[in-house]
Every structure is written in structure tokens, then in C-alpha cells.
């Protein structure tokens, strides 16, 4: 087992990474609170109820999918907590993927003006990305995560064993976020991904531990430098400007988050290449790596149809589009001076972009 620590001005918390560690750490943390509640999906509870060791009274189920990140679910969960006696010394445990983590964190941040919570991510995507950093959020029709807070957990417990029951498509979706870290700041991680594709797809425990740890070190570094996303933290959104637009256009049903981010990273890198921001070799290596992990890189939507979503992206300001574009493998920059028409023109120039 390994331990990392997130060190912020007003909050410090551990990240535990190991195999079959869930039961031990869950018991240790549950003893710290007056009441403990687990927010999860029913199928996850059925798979791990022996590890969770909690009665049905302590479980609050959430439907699967991005549609659960809604005001409707926030109100329902908050009422469930109130009816079951949750007080200010209670804690809620997010046991699931990014949807569960984002939703649970948001509820924790506003219920009784803030109660404690623990992240227990069960998907690769949540383990390497969304479970740390304190971002919580829900979706509205106009875009993803437009309503949210910054609210950090007491701890993050990453049990690699939970990836054994993760469907292949969900697992691959998480790999996109690992590739992102390689692209934005860790060239050696990107090289490792290129050389160990088969072992990663086969869920080799030692290989998984390595890429999870390396990803978290990247995320931890950025969050500690820029907790509230005023500057540096924006680079974590590489691929997400286009990716979130693609997710929203598809009604949060057609694509998993990582699938949309994979297309988004490819579009951003293609754009960078077309405007002379990066060499073709950067685009080619990213393309080859994404394809080797089984991602479909075809954007099914017209670029013009995505622009409305892109202009509502959280990084945008004054109607201007901000994009994270790669200079080379392991280095990206925030680009603010691109015109909408130039983005559309550049992306439409390539075969397979839009219809």
C-alpha cells in the first residue's frame, strides 16, 4: 500500500492506494463520525456489501449515469439524510465513479452548510482524477458541472481491487485521463503508456499501481499550486472543452466521459497542429496511443453545433474561448486569443471532423 498527501492551506488529507484495502480503511474512518452513510449504486452495493459492512439504513442509492448529477437528486439525497438523522458530525462516503463522487461531494458541501465526506472511487477515471482536488458539481441543460463547489474530502481510499468488476468500456474511459496527464506534464508517463498498452488493458496490478500513482502525483501537484483553478489548474482540462461539449450534445448518454475526452484531446491537438502550435509528431503519437487503447476518435457532430457549449465552458470569459493546447508531449499552454471562426475553419479542414 502507498500513501500520498494533499497539502492545501486550509485542508490536508491522505490518499491511500492499495489492493483489497477497502474494509480496513472504511472501518477506521467510520468510527470517527456520529453517523455514516454510503452513497452508491445498487449493483455496487451487491458486489461489495461484505467489504462495506453497513446496513441498508446507511445506504442511499443513486441511479447510474450523468443524469443523476441533478438538482432533483441533490434534494432527494438531502431529504434522505435529514430523515435518517444525519447531523453536522456525520459523514457520507462516495462509493462509485465520478458521478457518485461529484454528486456526493456537492451534497456534503451544502447539507447543513457542510458535513464531512470520504471519496472511495471504484472506476479508473475517478481514481486518477475526479476523486481528488475538491471539485464537486451537477449538470444542467446548458452544460456539464456548471453548478458546483470546491469542497475537499477527509480522505481518498483507492482500492485497485474494485477495477476487477469494472466493465471494459468504463475501464478504457479512465485510461483517457491517464493519457491526459502524460500529455500535459509527464512525458515519461506517456512513454510508459506507449510501451505497456497490453499490460494496462489486462489490468496488471503492478502496472496499474504505477499509472494511478503517477497520475495522482500530477493532479496533486497542480491542485496544491492552484486549488481554485485561477491559472495552472486549467491545464487539467486539456481535451475537456471539446469533450464536455460532445457529452452535452449527446445528452450525456452517447459517450462516457473518457470517450468524449479522448475525442476532445484529439481535436485540441489537431487544432494545435493546424495553427502551427505543435509538430505533427505530437498529433501522431497521441492519435496512435488513443487508437491503441481502442478509442474511436471520430467526432459525430458538426463543429458549429459544439461552439455554443464551448462558449459556456467554465474557462471561457467575456465570450472568449480559452483552450488548452499541446506544445509537445508533456507540455501544454492556455491559449486565449483564438477566434471562433478560426477554430471552426481549422477543425473542419480535417477529414472525419463533423458531418
From Swiss-Prot:
The keyword Metal-binding is annotated on this UniProt entry: yes
Q: Where is this chain's protein located in or outside the cell?
A: Cytoplasm
The metabolic or biological pathway listed in the UniProt record of this protein is: Metabolic intermediate biosynthesis; chorismate biosynthesis; chorismate from D-erythrose 4-phosphate and phosphoenolpyruvate: step 2/7
Binding of Zn(2+), residues: 177, 240, 257
An example of a GO molecular function for this protein is:
nucleotide binding
Q: Where does NAD(+) bind?
A: 98-102, 122-123, 135, 144, 162-165
Catalyzed chemical reaction(s): 7-phospho-2-dehydro-3-deoxy-D-arabino-heptonate = 3-dehydroquinate + phosphate
Q: What does the UniProt keyword field contain?
A: Amino-acid biosynthesis, Aromatic amino acid biosynthesis, Cobalt, Cytoplasm, Lyase, Metal-binding, NAD, Nucleotide-binding, Zinc
The protein's matches in CDD domains, at most eight in alphabetical order, are given as: DHQS (cd08195)
Q: Which GO terms describe its biological process?
A: amino acid biosynthetic process; aromatic amino acid family biosynthetic process; chorismate biosynthetic process
Provide the E.C. number(s) assigned to this enzyme: 4.2.3.4
UniProt xrefs under InterPro entries: Dehydroquinate_synthase, DHQ_synth_AroB, DHQ_synth_fam, DHQS/DOIS_N, DHQS_C
Superkingdom assignment: Bacteria
Write down how the cofactor binds this protein. Binds 1 divalent metal cation per subunit. Can use either Co(2+) or Zn(2+).
Keyword Amino-acid biosynthesis tagged:
yes
Q: What does this protein do?
A: Catalyzes the conversion of 3-deoxy-D-arabino-heptulosonate 7-phosphate (DAHP) to dehydroquinate (DHQ).
Q: Which protein family is it in? A: Belongs to the sugar phosphate cyclases superfamily. Dehydroquinate synthase family.
Q: What is this protein called?
A: 3-dehydroquinate synthase
- From what organism does this protein derive? Dictyoglomus thermophilum (strain ATCC 35947 / DSM 3960 / H-6-12)
Amino acid at each position: 500500500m502507498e500513501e500520498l498527501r494533499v497539502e492545501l492551506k486550509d485542508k490536508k488529507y491522505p490518499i491511500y492506494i492499495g489492493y483489497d484495502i477497502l474494509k480496513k480503511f472504511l472501518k477506521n474512518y467510520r468510527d470517527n463520525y456520529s453517523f455514516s452513510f454510503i452513497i452508491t449504486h445498487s449493483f455496487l452495493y451487491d458486489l461489495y456489501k461484505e467489504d462495506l459492512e453497513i446496513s441498508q439504513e446507511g445506504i442511499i442509492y443513486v441511479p447510474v449515469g450523468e443524469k443523476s448529477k441533478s438538482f432533483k437528486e441533490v434534494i432527494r439525497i438531502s431529504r434522505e439524510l435529514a430523515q435518517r438523522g444525519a447531523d453536522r458530525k456525520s459523514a457520507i462516503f462516495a462509493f462509485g465513479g465520478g458521478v457518485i463522487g461529484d454528486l456526493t461531494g456537492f451534497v456534503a458541501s451544502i447539507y447543513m452548510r457542510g458535513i464531512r465526506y470520504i471519496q472511495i472511487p471504484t472506476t479508473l477515471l475517478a481514481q486518477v482524477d475526479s476523486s481528488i482536488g475538491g471539485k464537486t458539481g451537477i449538470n444542467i441543460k446548458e452544460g456539464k458541472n456548471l453548478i458546483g463547489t470546491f469542497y475537499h474530502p477527509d480522505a481518498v481510499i483507492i482500492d485497485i481491487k474494485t477495477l476487477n468488476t469494472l466493465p471494459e468500456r468504463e475501464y478504457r474511459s479512465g485510461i483517457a485521463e491517464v493519457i491526459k496527464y502524460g500529455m500535459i506534464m509527464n512525458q515519461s508517463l506517456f512513454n510508459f503508456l506507449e510501451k505497456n498498452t497490453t499490460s494496462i488493458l489486462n489490468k496488471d496490478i503492478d502496472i496499474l499501481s504505477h499509472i494511478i500513482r503517477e497520475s495522482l502525483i500530477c493532479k496533486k501537484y497542480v491542485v496544491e499550486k492552484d486549488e481554485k483553478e485561477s491559472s495552472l489548474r486549467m491545464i487539467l482540462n486539456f481535451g475537456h472543452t471539446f469533450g464536455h461539449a460532445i457529452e452535452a450534445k449527446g445528452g450525456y448518454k452517447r459517450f462516457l466521459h473518457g470517450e468524449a475526452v479522448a475525442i476532445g484531446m484529439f481535436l485540441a491537438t489537431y487544432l494545435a497542429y493546424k495553427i502551427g502550435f505543435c509538430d505533427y509528431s505530437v498529433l501522431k503519437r497521441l492519435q496512435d496511443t488513443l487508437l491503441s487503447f481502442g478509442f474511436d476518435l471520430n467526432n459525430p457532430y458538426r463543429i458549429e453545433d459544439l461552439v455554443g457549449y464551448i462558449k459556456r465552458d467554465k474557462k471561457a470569459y467575456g465570450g472568449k474561448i480559452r483552450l488548452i493546447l499541446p506544445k509537445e508531449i508533456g507540455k501544454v499552454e492556455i491559449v486565449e486569443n483564438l477566434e471562433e471562426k478560426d477554430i471552426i475553419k481549422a477543425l473542419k479542414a480535417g477529414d472525419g471532423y463533423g458531418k
